[in-house]
């Protein structure tokens, strides 16, 4: 892992790098910029605040956070060295407040250890392939142009999309097409790939697009855009282990948050969004049995959800940036003092069981006598030491 690579990438950028950075920034509009900034900002309004953008990309969200918070220190991570190079130029005015790290996001813990940071105040994820990668034909992410089948977010990674196509078994290809591409015709496409590669290995995206088009029903070819898009998504996710990286990164990111710290995640397809939704829901839920009158220490919610469902871009942004259409934003705040003591459970009225004496139909309400007992494992006066006992 290369820590603090800012000087290095600036030194290697060469003539024209700043111009390329400005051009790329102009073409790459940061998705849900205002909403992402607002959801993170309350954790950054204090001296010495530190945030991590673990998928820095072109640095659009990072630039806005640094602009709004003059005392903020930012750690920017990305697995794509080209993105780091361009982001270094875009963020040059904040050079004394940023540290750039060449790493996949699941290397967050190691990166913070190397920088001597035990906790941070905010962590931001902007998942999926970037506009920069889609627009660079030689990267092989786009099915709209004929190019080499690469799809590596980090060009130094060992496995390309061509390697997957030419070496995976029929069952492996079927699995990734079905699971990662949600492709209904996965077995048929996998069979065609195995058959065609025996004649000649796959090297170009155009040949793969033609193969997919020839092996899906005519009705599918006429609707829903390019029929190869699901196959390309599946290959990209497999080559970069995108879902595995998300699953490994989120727990590390939350554990490194300071109390009141905030975690925000932008997703762009249902597979990664499902992982994020489940992880954040688990953090914001109690693991105690629902019938207990108190929440035992260690089983209470660790986070508060800051977004209702997956928030989406508004109509004005969609008109300006169609790529924002699939974006979903989810965020949580780490609760202070979570997991340290037991606390009384408050059960919403809608979840209370119908019992005699609660005023339900057929059971006239009668006065209840509140009795209290001391929890055996807590000292009197501690939060949660006294709980209501239902007679």
Curated annotation (Swiss-Prot):
Residues 1-23, 284-391 are annotated as: Disordered. It is an enzyme of class 2 (transferase). The keyword Transferase applies. One of its GO terms (biological process) is rRNA base methylation. InterPro entries: RsmH, SAM-dep_MeTrfase_MraW_recog, SAM-dependent_MTases_sf. It comes from the Bacteria. Residues 368-380 have a biased composition (Basic and acidic residues). It is found in: Cytoplasm. The keyword rRNA processing applies. GO terms for cellular component: cytoplasm. Keywords: Cytoplasm, Methyltransferase, rRNA processing, S-adenosyl-L-methionine, Transferase. Belongs to the methyltransferase superfamily. RsmH family. Specifically methylates the N4 position of cytidine in position 1402 (C1402) of 16S rRNA. This is Ribosomal RNA small subunit methyltransferase H.
